[in-house]
């Protein structure tokens, strides 16, 4: 089970402002449960910037992503698919982790 989660620094503002409310992860990074509280750090420097509470974990495929998922990521669907392809090349099976920010 994950005990912390990291995000690229470019997503920090959107997370803190409540504009990014989900994250899409591979199977290895999907081991969280609803209700779990995780410290959040930047991927680049591991600087803590908030805590989140996991609300939901749902399997989803790359081809199953919708505009709603993109809105929850504060992106267009095209941008979301591009970002996922950069982070997880050639991966179809993803896991959507919906969360809320607890502390800033």
Curated annotation (Swiss-Prot):
Active site per the UniProt annotation: 20 (proton acceptor), 23 (nucleophile), 73 (proton donor)
Protein name: N(4)-acetylcytidine amidohydrolase
Role noted for this protein: Catalyzes the hydrolysis of N(4)-acetylcytidine (ac4C).
Family annotation (HAMAP family): ac4C_amidohydr (MF_00684)
Cystine connections: none
Entry's EC annotation: 3.5.1.135
Any GO MF annotation of the entry: N4-acetylcytidine amidohydrolase activity
Family listed: Belongs to the N(4)-acetylcytidine amidohydrolase family.
UniProt GO cellular component terms: cytosol
Top-level enzyme category: hydrolase
Record-annotated ASCH domain positions: 6-101
SUPFAM superfamilies documented for this protein: PUA domain-like (SSF88697)
Stored InterPro entries: AC4CH, ASCH_domain, PUA-like_sf
NCBIfam families: PRK04980.1
Catalytic activity: N(4)-acetylcytidine + H2O = cytidine + acetate + H(+); N(4)-acetyl-2'-deoxycytidine + H2O = 2'-deoxycytidine + acetate + H(+); N(4)-acetylcytosine + H2O = cytosine + acetate + H(+)
Biological source species: Shewanella oneidensis (strain ATCC 700550 / JCM 31522 / CIP 106686 / LMG 19005 / NCIMB 14063 / MR-1)
Protein origin, superkingdom: Bacteria
CDD domains registered for this protein in UniProt: ASCH_yqfb_like (cd06552)
Keywords associated with the record: Hydrolase
């Amino acid at each position: 089970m994950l005990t912390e989660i990291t995000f690229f620094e470019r997503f920090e503002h959107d997370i803190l402002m409540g504009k990014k409310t989900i994250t899409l992860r591979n199977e290895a990074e999907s081991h969280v449960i609803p209700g779990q509280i995780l410290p959040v750090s930047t991927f680049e420097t591991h600087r803590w910037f908030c805590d989140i509470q996991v609300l939901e974990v749902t399997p989803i495929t790359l081809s199953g992503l919708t505009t709603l998922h993109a809105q929850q990521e504060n992106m267009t669907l095209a941008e979301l698919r591009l970002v996922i392809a950069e982070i997880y090349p050639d991966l179809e099976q993803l896991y959507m982790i919906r969360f809320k920010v607890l502390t800033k």
